[in-house]
């Protein structure tokens, strides 16, 4: 029996098993086996040749955003509208066959936008170019899931399932579980909170399935067996996702209102160029970027060339971005902006910068 058949059998077994106290250990084991087989499926084949058209794109700009969706939901049209890149767009499926990059220039930042080929159902099993599409998606900072508003619910659940099966966790945080395999001493299990979904016995069963008999486990939050399996496997990607419902000109106002109220969702129409500005604002928020402007002594700030950093970046991060040796020569910095009580304020390396702050660095 091949890996795909084993995965299919386990999925059927999970679907027909009623969830209750008596079956929780059985379900936990099935989920551990399923995660193990899926990990094997995603490993690149040793016999596979490396010939063929290049697919991955070199990372550039200040952030990377992956456009994911089924064929013909409007990804190529969106890329053409947002960037200067022309991605071939047509009203039939599978127009885009390779990964097309573009750059959005917004608030001084260059955001790389990747138009990935349309995902079809079963992409995780390698159908179409699904596996390559998902591999590129794992390298992004944010995923934009493009959905056709006329069939958005069906597409959304299918795409979420595909991404979940390859270890991409959308709009979730990494489980707060400390896990460390050891050479001996058995399994040490502790928790700082009351656990309602995992027990010591279930944790041991899951670890034994992965041939781990000596480990230290500490739960700092109430997690499910699936989340614990994610911690053991360790190659999961936790990523913010923006659900974008396109073609809202083809549905009723009531349906548009319902979709717009969903969490992490934006409604747009690429054909009529509706709501694209709001989508850019939301994307900026999800990327959590800040613009920092520099100032030389006795001169005006340079507002033409911003330093783009992650939200919560310190003065030390700014120093490293300017020059790697600057932090070692640092004496103090003068900062103007919302991060200070008064302007300018003299600060040290640990000071946290805010969006559109101005900084002047003084060396020793």
Swiss-Prot record:
What cofactor does this chain's UniProt record say it requires?
A: Mg(2+)
Pfam families the UniProt entry points to = MMR_HSR1, MMR_HSR1_Xtn, TGS
Which residues are noted in the entry as Mg(2+)-binding?
76, 96
Q: Which GO terms describe its biological process?
A: cytoplasmic translation; signal transduction
Subcellular location(s) per record: Nucleus; Cytoplasm
GO cellular component annotations, sorted alphabetically?
cytoplasm; cytosol; intracellular membrane-bounded organelle; membrane; nucleoplasm; nucleus
**Catalytic activity line of the entry:** GTP + H2O = GDP + phosphate + H(+)
Chief location of this protein within or outside the cell: nucleus
User: Describe its PTM?
Assistant: Polyubiquitinated.
Entry annotated with the keyword Heme: no
Q: Hey, what tissues is this thing expressed in?
A: Highest levels in skeletal muscle, heart and kidney. Low levels in colon, thymus, spleen, small intestine, lung and Leukocytes.
The UniProt family comment states: Belongs to the TRAFAC class OBG-HflX-like GTPase superfamily. OBG GTPase family.
Descriptive protein name = Developmentally-regulated GTP-binding protein 2
